[in-house]
Amino acid sequence: MSLNLVKALKLHNEKIWDIDCYKGLLATASTDRRIKIVNIGDIGDGLVSDDGRLLDELDDSSHKKTVRSVAWRPHSTILAAGSFDSTVSIWAKDENDGDADGDGGVDDPSSFSMELLAVIEGHENEVKSVAWSKDGYFLATCSRDKSVWIWESDEMGEEYECISVLQEHSQDVKHVVWHPFKDILASSSYDDTIRIWKEYDDDWEAAAVLKGHEGTVWGSDFEKNVNTDIVRLCSGSDDTTVKIWRCVSNESIEEDWICEATLPNVHGKPVYSVSWSEDGLIASAGSDGMLVIYKENKDNVWEVVAKHEHSHSIYEINVVKWIKLNNGKSYLATAGDDGYVNIWAYN
C-alpha cells in the first residue's frame, strides 16, 4: 500500500490551519486572514495547474486576525469561518454564479463569487473550530474561552440564534465535530478530554467525558459507517497517540464510552488532525510531518497500511481530511505551515 502525491498547491504565503472540500470546492483558512476558494474537482484527472483554479479570495478585512477554521454547510455552498478575532463569518456563493445547472458545482469559474451573509459574535476569545450538523440546522463553534456554542441557523444561512452555551471544559477547546448521521457533537480540549454532547428536553447536555489521553486532544472524527448503529470516534493528541472510542450504552442522556483501541504508535510528535473515511480508513497527521493511514483487519485489530514522512517537507501538518473529487474517487488532502495543500492518492 502506498501514498502518492497527486498535486501540491501553493495557496498561501503563511500557515494554512484548516481546509474543507465540497463538490471540488476547496476552502482554506490561513494566518494571513484570507480564505481562498479553489476548484480542485478535476485534480484526480490531472487537469489542475500547480496553483489550482482560484475562484475567489474572500476579503482579508473581514477578520482582524488569523482564520483558524472553515466548514461548508452540508449540501450547500454556504461557508462558515472561525477566527482568532473571536468572530465567525458566514459566506455564500451566488447560486447563479458559475453554476448553470444548479448542482452546486462550478460550470463557469470566471463568474464565481462569494458574498458575506453574516458575522456571528459571542465568544470572548479566539474561535478555534466551526462545524455544521448533519443537516446544516446547527452550527457548533468552540473557543479559547473554554466554551462550545451551538447556534440554530435559518434555511438561507443568514440568521443565527445561540441556543446553548456549553462550559464544562476546564481549558481551551480546540475542535468540534458532529456525527455524520446523528445529532451528536464531540469537542476536544486542552484539558486532555473529549466531551460528547446531545440534545435533551430542548437543551444540550454533556452525555460523556472521554478520558485517556495524556495531553491536549487536538481533534477527533466520527466513524461514517451507515450499516451499523455503533458509534465510534477517533482522536489525536499531544501525547502522540491516536485512540478509538466506542459508545457501549446510550439508554439515557448519560452514555458509557470505552477506549476501544490505541492505534500503532507511529508518530513521534503531537497528532494535530485525524480523519475517518467512508471506507473505514483512518488518517492522522501532525507536528512530525508524517501522514499515516490505518485499517481495521478482520480480527478488529488496527494496522498501519501506509505512511509518508516529510509530507510537507520540514513543516508541520495542521489538518488532514478525506475528500471526494469529480471522478468519484477518495483522496487525502493535507495542509501545513508551508502554505501548501497537498492532494494524495492512496493505492
UniProtKB/Swiss-Prot annotation:
Where is it found, in Gene Ontology cellular component terms?
cytosolic [4Fe-4S] assembly targeting complex; nucleus
Write out the annotated subcellular location: Cytoplasm; Nucleus
**Which BP terms from GO are recorded?**
iron-sulfur cluster assembly; tRNA wobble uridine modification
Source organism's superkingdom? Eukaryota
Q: Where are the WD repeats?
A: 11-48, 62-101, 122-161, 168-207, 212-255, 266-304, 311-347
Q: How does it assemble?
A: Interacts with NAR1.
Which purpose does this protein serve, as stated in its record? Answer: Essential component of the cytosolic iron-sulfur (Fe/S) protein assembly machinery. Required for the maturation of extramitochondrial Fe/S proteins.
Name of the protein this chain belongs to: Probable cytosolic iron-sulfur protein assembly protein 1
